[in-house]
Design a protein with these regions (language model features):
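Conserved donor-binding/catalytic core segment of Leloir-type glycosyltransferases
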Residues: 203, 215-243, 256
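N-terminal subdomain of nucleotide-sugar transferases
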Residues: 1-64, 174, 243
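Membrane-proximal helix-turn-helix segments that form the acceptor-binding/catalytic region
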Residues: 24, 100, 118, 125-130, ...
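Carbohydrate-associated surface elements
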Residues: 41, 181, 199-202
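Nucleotide-activated donor-binding/catalytic signature segment of Leloir-type glycosyltransferases, i.e.
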Residues: 265-289
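An aromatic- and histidine-rich active-site surface loop
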Residues: 18, 85-98, 108-139, 143-144
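Acidic anion/phosphate-binding donor-loop and adjacent secondary structure
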Residues: 33, 187, 197-198, 202-220, ...
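Acceptor-binding helix/loop patch of EC 2.4 sugar-transfer enzymes
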Residues: 12, 76-83, 130-166
Length: 295
């Protein structure tokens, strides 16, 4: 890349939602690139539009010198499979419409493939129409994640998904993966000659001098999970395993779950009010060092 070039980031989530792509955008901007973002109105993880934002068809705002183009977001997807399905389709359609009008002005397109691969279609539209260099940074692998969310693997669905995934990955010029294990999963779908770039997620630069938070009144061994509380995280197995511990060990231990997501209500019911399993909810990123140091 050359400085002063224009980069469009296509992503389902962006500030004020907390993901690594926020840091990437600011880093490129600080290096002299002109960075714009095409995304949705912010709703993650609660499925509701953040206070101070409106859910219009097309809106503009700005984050520390990065221009943001936002399109309408589906809300209420945490509690409805139908709405979750519409959520997958929504950005694919509205984002692609906007991409047709703004795509020509950019030198590079960078797709932050956080979840659904359908969210990367606006990037592919720009590639097809304007032949711009286009890269995906893959955080979640399709079609595997579709089945992991509970969709039954039928011959028809498998055929459709395989064709879609292959179409998407045959219309990019570069691909980065956040886990080396993704390479074998994606290899059947990428075009010949396309090399994998390994770009793992990194640890936050936290203030480790912060005083640890008191996670319990009594001295205990603390086990802590922090992140998205969804179905694919398989936290039910962790809770079930913790509940199988003898009472003596449980009283000396505490399982802390930090975060929010679509599976939170189910996991709270599963814990059955176990006093040694504590759900702390979503916490600020800058406060996480206090939890880590106490664990």
């Amino acid at each position: 890349m050359t400085k002063n070039k224009k980069i469009l980031i296509v992503t389902e989530c962006f500030y004020p939602e907390e993901f690594k792509i926020n840091d990437v955008a600011l880093s490129w901007k600080d290096k002299g690139y002109h960075v714009d973002v095409l995304t949705l109105a912010p709703t993650y993880p609660l499925g509701k539009v953040f206070p101070g934002y409106k859910n219009g068809f097309f809106r503009k705002d700005e984050y520390q010198g990065v221009n943001i183009f936002r399109v309408h977001a589906v809300t209420g997807y945490r509690d409805s499979t139908v709405k979750k399905t519409f959520k997958y389709i929504n950005f694919m359609i509205f984002g692609s419409i906007v991409a047709i009008f703004i795509g020509r002005r950019y030198d590079y397109v960078f797709g932050f493939n956080l979840g659904s691969l359908t969210d990367m279609l606006p990037a592919v539209v720009i590639r097809k129409l304007y032949k711009k260099p286009t890269m995906f940074w893959v955080q979640d692998v399709w079609p595997d994640s579709v089945y992991a969310y509970g969709f039954k693997k039928t011959k028809m669905l498998s055929t459709l998904l395989d064709a879609f995934v292959k179409f998407m990955h045959h219309n990019i010029t570069a691909v980065a993966i956040s886990s080396k294990g993704f390479e074998s999963k994606l290899e059947p779908y990428i075009k010949k000659g396309l090399k994998f770039n390994y770009a793992p997620n990194w640890a936050d630069d936290l203030d480790m001098d912060m005083v640890p938070i008191a996670l319990s009144k009594n001295q205990k061994i603390h086990f802590t999970f922090a992140g998205n509380v969804g179905k694919v995280q398989n936290l039910e197995n962790i809770i079930n395993a913790f509940c199988l511990l003898p009472d003596g060990y449980q009283k000396k231990s505490q399982l802390n779950i930090i975060g929010d997501g679509s599976n939170l209500i189910f996991l709270k019911k599963l814990s059955n009010n176990n006093p040694n399993i504590i759900f702390h909810g979503k916490q600020k990123r800058e406060d996480m060092a206090k939890f880590y140091k106490a664990s």
